[in-house]
Amino acid sequence: MTLRISAPILNFADGRLGDGLPQIAWQRHYTVDDQPIAAAFGRVLSDRMADLIDVAMAVYVADRLRRREPSPRSDPFRLGWSRTMCIRLGVREPAVWRSTEVRARLGAVLGWLTEDDWNFDFVKRTKPQRPSQAQGFLFATAPQAPATVGLFSGGLDSLVGAAELVDRPSAGDLILISASSSTRLRGLQTQLARRLRSRGKTVISVRVPFNLTGATSPDLHEISQRSRGFVFLALGSAAAVTAGTTDLRLFENGIGAVNLPYLECQVGTHSTRSAHPATLRLFMDLLRALQFPLQISNPYFWLTKAEVCSRLPTQFHDLVGISESCDGFPQRVEGQPRCGICTACVLRAQALTVSGLSHLEDWSRYRRAPLLALAEGGADSWPGRAMLYQVEVLRSALEANEPWAAALDAFPSLARLPGNLEDGPLGRQIARSELLSLLRRYVHEWDSVNKVGGYRERVSLPDHVTKGGVA
């Protein structure tokens, strides 16, 4: 198949195929080392799984190399956000990837995650295999059943998820799969996994580095990176399938997974969807089309972040300070403090305070103590104030005579949730009720924190911030 679309084609295939398209090459322009997955279990990756990782990396690289259009004042809702993406990629099983079902499933999950139109030209791969496929193993290393594979970011939610599994006597081996483009973040993940392992459970830590290389200019990279969730799910699936399990878990509180917009100017994928229930279902649809019957679940979806924190077993309290939430962590110089003003820092502080675990945090490691910065106001407190603005919008909807209808009016993206959580009319009705309960508990948590800080006085934001001008 030849792509006949006016958008430029990003060529990841072998050579130029006679049409003069420059090649975007592994190791020269980007790297991914999936060898740790094969080495952890003594099994080479299957052709189809290796292809899935190649597809994920091509998507990630294309996402980074094609800038989204800047938002002029005439386009306050950033309708020019979406792009047409055209990729030529060499795969080991082109017939599989050219099939109607696989194309449809791939386009559906990528379109939902990035709000871009993705077009692929799959050709036969002729490059040598990567080490994850080329190196044979004398003995397979099967994890002790029932093994659990979980995505592990090094944040609070994934720490609690891993700690609960380590603390559970009946659970088998725990496999933590981490993927990162930051050397420092991989070091933190390694440290946490080592500390978890020291508590007696077999913890297999699999870390997969990936990144763009110096052959591309960082100044030209797209920073939104909405495709990262696809990479994480692909690598997590590769680990689960290679380990011989049929389940993959990610650990994300429900408020973070739904990720409702804070402000009116945030439309569609301006809010990330990496852990959204629709993302998990669409990705599982793709896996089924590829003949991988993997179940992906989020056991913390019906909990707030504070409720997740409250489940942390006491013996792991000392690991809270090692975990990391700050959005700016990968870019920070070692030894520099957390920012304390990003939404991730603010929500972490709120959750630790509400759960009664704030004493476990070393607040001197923040440039500004998050809740104090929010109480004091100032120009750099707008992310936290945006969170409070969202809380007040939620409060108004939840106090209405028809709370679900009011919530849908305020946050139209909620409409997609019930059908991705439960099947059938009754199931969707139950899901709506549970979602309203989750949102009410979240609002009440902020009320309990507000009694001390008086944060509701800081809710007001200028119209140009709530309705446009802020990404």
For each feature predicted by the language model, list its residue ranges.
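RNA-binding accessory domains that recognize and position tRNA/RNA substrates
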Residues: 1-150, 162-212, 450-452, 459, ...
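ATP/NTP-dependent adenylation/nucleotidyl-transfer catalytic domains that generate, transfer
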Residues: 2-24, 40-45, 259-260, 264-268, ...
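ATP-dependent adenylate-handling ligase core
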Residues: 42-45, 177-318
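Short helix-capping/linker segments at secondary-structure and domain boundaries
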Residues: 66-79, 240-248, 352-357
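Short, solvent-exposed polar/charged micro-motifs at secondary-structure junctions
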Residues: 97, 128-135, 214-220, 304-311, ...
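Conserved adenosyl
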Residues: 153
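Hydrophobic positions on the alpha1 helix immediately C-terminal to the Walker A/P-loop
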Residues: 157-161
